[in-house]
Amino acid sequence: MEERERIIHLWFKMWLTKQDLGIDDIFEEDVTYVESWGPKYHNRKMVKHWFHEWNTRGKVLVWNIKQFFHKGDQTVVEWYF
C-alpha cells in the first residue's frame, strides 16, 4: 500500500510541477487511464501526450489528497482541486 501511495503522490506532483518525473515508470505500455469526468487514454503514449499537451496551456495550482482506499489490488484516491 505504501508503494501505491508513493506512486500516486508522484503522479500528482508531476501535474503540480508540470514535469514528467517518470510516467514511463508508473504506467504500463497498455494502460487505460480514465479521467474523473470521463475521457479515456488507451496506452502510455497517449497518457504522455495528454500530460504534455495539457501542461502547455494549463496549470494545476492545488491537488490535495484527502484519503486513500485500499481493497485487494486496487487503490482509490479521494482528492480535491
Question: Model regions: which residues?
Answer:
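Small-side-chain structural scaffolding
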Residues: 14, 31, 75-76
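Amphipathic alpha-helical repeat scaffolds
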Residues: 9-13
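A solvent-exposed, acidic/Ser-Thr-rich amphipathic alpha-helical stretch
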Residues: 2-3, 20-72
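A short hydrophobic beta-strand element
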Residues: 72-81
